[in-house]
């Protein structure tokens, strides 16, 4: 089957969790599945910007991105984080090829506005061409995508990694989209992890401010993927990534399965 795995930046920064995620991704590919990885790196980007004397600001979980922040994102996401993940997957025994959404015109972006507000070089995916991803699969490789894409103006745009993962899953007609995150799953008002969550329930939780911050774009991406034909979407804690190879074989007790309604 075709599986897109989005790995959060926090998981990549922790050495033990990174190894666990990389081993699971490699094992999926070794089992004959077509696997693509999309990654974030928000914490590392925030840390680098802080070292450069820049403060990070967010609107609904999306980073306000001026030109300097965008260039730093290219360095951190397209460089350091991407190559770190590639190295980990290859250490687990599978060839991995790192690139960003702008390479090969794989993804095109347009400027994204939130509540009418211009966030700078923040984009949303408006076009996807998965031919290079499929070419890597044909050669037995694992594509590793950084969440940056080119606009029609020739500028790079910072794209929310959850949104890019959803677009990648839809473009590749993926059977499954899995988010490996630094949280145990989606929590209800009482703080308990919800094993199942419909997109309708997610909208209600967002309206009631039960979910906020980075979980908002993640759940929007889940809904986007399901609406565009992706069969299954699940949010899993990256610390339990070893369950990934059993995804189709057994019922998982961790994380949240998101369904369309």
What residue spans do the PLM features occupy?
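C-terminal catalytic "cap/lid" subdomain
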Residues: 1-261
């Amino acid at each position: 089957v075709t599986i897109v795995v989005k790995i959060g930046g926090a998981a990549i920064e922790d050495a033990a969790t990174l190894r666990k995620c990389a081993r699971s991704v490699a094992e999926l590919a070794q089992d004959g599945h077509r696997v693509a990885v999309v990654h974030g790196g928000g914490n590392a980007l925030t840390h680098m910007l802080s070292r450069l004397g820049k403060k990070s600001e967010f609107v609904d979980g999306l980073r306000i991105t001026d030109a300097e922040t965008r260039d730093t994102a290219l360095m951190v996401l397209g460089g350091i984080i991407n190559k770190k993940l590639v190295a980990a997957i290859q250490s687990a025994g599978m060839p991995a090829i790192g690139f960003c959404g702008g390479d090969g015109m794989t993804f095109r972006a347009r400027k994204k506005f939130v509540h009418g507000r211009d966030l700078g070089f923040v984009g949303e995916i408006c076009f996807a061409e998965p031919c290079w991803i499929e070419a890597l699969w044909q050669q037995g490789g694992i594509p590793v995508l950084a969440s940056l894409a080119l606009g029609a103006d020739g500028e790079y745009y910072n794209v929310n990694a959850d949104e890019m993962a959803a677009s990648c899953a839809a473009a590749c007609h993926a059977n499954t989209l899995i988010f490996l995150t630094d949280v145990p799953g989606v929590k209800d008002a009482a703080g308990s992890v919800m094993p199942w969550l419909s997109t309708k329930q997610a909208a209600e939780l967002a309206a009631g401010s039960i979910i906020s911050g980075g979980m908002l774009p993640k759940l929007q991406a889940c809904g986007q993927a399901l609406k565009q034909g992706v069969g299954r979407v699940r949010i899993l804690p990256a610390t339990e990534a070893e369950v990934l190879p059993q995804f189709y074989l057994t019922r998982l007790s961790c994380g949240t399965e998101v369904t369309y309604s």
